[in-house]
Amino acid sequence: MADENLQPVFQIQRVYLKDLSLEQPNSPAIFLEQDAPVIEVAVDVGAEQLAEGLFESTVTITVTAKINDKVAFLVEAKQAGIFEARNIPDEQLDPLIGIGCPSTIYPYLRANIADAITRAGFPPVHLSEINFEVFYQQRLEALAQQHASNGSGIVMPDGSAAQH
């Protein structure tokens, strides 16, 4: 029976849209513009330990569309998920929380952003796939630079180690 309790567990508890904002500061005049918008996309990833074995993972994306230096729209959305991860070694837990969880919730975020932009009266912006391993590696490098030796080994959005 004790062996069963030590089996690795990883499952999604919930996926939810944590924040969504849309701004159209130059409407309705912007709809009369004939030029194609220039799209800028910014991405951020976060993680927080909620309780023993429970983690919240977030992906935030800001999409800004400009036509002739005027903002057509700005959408910022944060998709989150609560994940249960128990009996997983730190060397496997870190990549799971830093890479696997964001990869799981990102498709929901892409759909929500495309829907918000379409409902605002613009053609949808189809966000490309993201390699979340790059974000994870950047955070590991930041953590190594800070020489943080105490913590759970989970790298937080600011590059610090999560504390137990």
Curated annotation (Swiss-Prot):
GO BP of this protein: protein folding; protein tetramerization; protein transport
Statement: the UniProt record of this protein carries the keyword Protein transport: yes
Keywords from the UniProt entry: Chaperone, Cytoplasm, Protein transport, Translocation, Transport
Oligomeric form and interacting partners: Homotetramer, a dimer of dimers. One homotetramer interacts with 1 SecA dimer.
Name by which UniProt lists this protein: Protein-export protein SecB
Assigned protein family: Belongs to the SecB family.
Subcellular localization: Cytoplasm
Gene3D superfamilies from the UniProt entry: SecB-like
Role: One of the proteins required for the normal export of preproteins out of the cell cytoplasm. It is a molecular chaperone that binds to a subset of precursor proteins, maintaining them in a translocation-competent state. It also specifically binds to its receptor SecA.
HAMAP family to which the protein is assigned, alphabetical: SecB (MF_00821)
GO cellular component: cytoplasm
MF (Gene Ontology): unfolded protein binding
Pfam families documented for this protein: SecB
Residue ranges that the Swiss-Prot or TrEMBL entry lists as coiled coil: none
Keyword Chaperone included in the entry's annotation: yes
InterPro entries per UniProt: SecB (IPR003708), SecB-like_sf (IPR035958)
Principal cellular location given in the protein's record: cytoplasm
